[in-house]
C-alpha cells in the first residue's frame, strides 16, 4: 500500500511538471493468455495426477493390511483357538496395527510434501510467466512512450482509455475478443 501511495504521489508530482503517458493492464488476464499458460496448467495437472497415484499406492498398502487385520480378528473369534494360538494372533494384530500407524503417518507426510511441491511448482511457473510479461510490458511501454503502466488491480480507479490490455494481448498473439478469462469475475 505504501508503494502504491508513493507511486501515486510520484505520478501526481510528475504530471504537474509535464504531460505523462500512463496506462493500465490486467496482468491476470495476460497471465491466462500467455503462450505458456496451457502447458503450465497441463504440467500442474499431470504432476498432481502423479502425486495422487503415489498416494493411492500408499492407501492401497494400508487397505491390504486392514484386510489382513480383519481376517485375524475373525480368527480371534474362533472358540477353538488355543491360548498360544490366540497369543500369536494378538501379536500379529499388534504388528499390523503398528504398520498401519506407520502407513497413516507416511500417507499424511507424503500428502503434505506433494501439496507443498505442487504449490512450489505453481509459484515457479507463475513467476516465470510474470517475469516474461514484465519484460514484454517494458518493451511495449518503451515503444509506446509510456511513463508508467500499472496493474489495473493495484489502482483504485482508472479510466477505460488508459487500459492497454488489448494491445498487450495482441502482442502475445491473442485476439482480445477470444481472450481467456475476459468475463471471469464480472
PLM feature spans:
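Positively charged n-region of N-terminal signal peptides that target proteins for export
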Residues: 1-4
